């Protein structure tokens, strides 16, 4: 909530990009084995939240900023985008199950609803109020 969803997505994407570039051995000058590197990214949707987040206070240093392409319904046209969407959803669902096992989050039944707005989840928010992990800017009830 503090940053807004677009900025938070941009920071997360830049963190992932910086980690990937470091793992690949790309140096701070954007070189790999003495040769310049180009990086591309495809975002599923109409908004490039990566480029606008570059060089902001919260953004990590990225040796090679990505050349970003946006594609609405990109998962229909690109296998890599579709695979990334599946990995992201499975990872998020696993995280929600782990969080749901913690006593302070049990009333929200995240182990079952994965944080989506099921009737039980909405009822728990109405009864117990939002948790410290809920986005207050989102319409919760």
Stretches found by the model and what they are:
Residues 1-141:
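RNase H-like, Mg2+-dependent phosphodiesterase core
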């Amino acid at each position: 909530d503090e940053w807004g969803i677009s900025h938070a997505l941009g920071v997360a994407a830049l963190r992932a990009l910086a980690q990937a570039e470091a793992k690949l051995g790309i140096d701070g000058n954007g070189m790999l084995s003495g040769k310049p590197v180009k990086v591309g990214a495809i975002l599923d949707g109409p908004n490039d939240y990566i480029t606008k987040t570059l060089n902001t206070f919260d953004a990590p240093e990225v040796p090679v900023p990505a050349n970003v392409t946006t594609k609405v319904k990109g998962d229909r046209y690109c296998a890599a985008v579709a695979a990334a969407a599946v990995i992201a959803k499975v990872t998020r669902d696993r995280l929600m199950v782990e969080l749901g096992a913690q006593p302070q989050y049990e009333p929200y039944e995240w182990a079952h609803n994965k944080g989506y707005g099921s009737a039980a989840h909405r009822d728990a928010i109405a009864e117990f109020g939002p948790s410290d992990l809920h986005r207050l800017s989102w319409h919760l009830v």
